[in-house]
């Protein structure tokens, strides 16, 4: 019997797969537990439509990511921080702070986990921050850390 898997079943199939399984296994286990349903022409076309929509969504997300990488590559971000003696910062600049500052200055939302620092930022100066969108796509921004004005 051909079934369409509604959920992942280890060793049998993943969600959306259409596979041939034993009739008894399908009728007694998969279908009653709502892990699969019999594969009919309507179900097959519905699954194909869902997969096509998912592919379009992934392609659109990839295109947006590439556009964002192009826009941010080489961007200059200025960050003001409180300092103590000898231009040392109170604490350090984290990826959370950098991501918030990028969003504030450019309007582009970046996940803090995508930011890579060569070293912790504990002093004033210019730093290069890598934004790794995926294994093949990355951008570099220039981060200028300056002293906050005391008022």
From Swiss-Prot:
GO terms for cellular component: ribonucleoprotein complex; ribosome. Keywords: Ribonucleoprotein, Ribosomal protein, RNA-binding, rRNA-binding. One of its GO terms (molecular function) is rRNA binding. It holds the Pfam family Ribosomal_L9_C. The keyword Metal-binding does not apply. PROSITE patterns: RIBOSOMAL_L9. Coiled coil: none annotated. One of its GO terms (biological process) is translation. The keyword Ribosomal protein applies. It comes from the Bacteria. Binds to the 23S rRNA. Belongs to the bacterial ribosomal protein bL9 family. This is Large ribosomal subunit protein bL9. The gene is rplI.
């Amino acid at each position: 019997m051909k079934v369409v898997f509604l959920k992942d079943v280890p060793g049998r199939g993943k969600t959306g797969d259409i596979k041939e399984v034993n009739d008894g296994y399908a009728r007694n286990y998969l279908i009653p537990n709502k892990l699969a349903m019999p594969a009919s022409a309507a179900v097959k076309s519905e699954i194909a439509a869902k997969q096509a929509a998912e592919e379009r969504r992934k392609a659109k997300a990839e295109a947006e990511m590439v556009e964002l990488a192009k826009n941010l590559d080489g961007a200059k971000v200025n960050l003001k921080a409180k300092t103590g003696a000898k231009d040392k910062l109170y604490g350090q600049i984290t990826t959370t702070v950098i991501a918030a500052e990028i969003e504030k200055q450019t309007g582009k939302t970046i996940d803090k986990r995508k930011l890579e620092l060569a070293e912790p930022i504990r002093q004033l100066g210019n730093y290069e921050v890598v934004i790794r969108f995926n294994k093949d796509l990355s951008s570099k921004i220039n981060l200028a850390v300056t002293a906050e004005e005391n008022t």
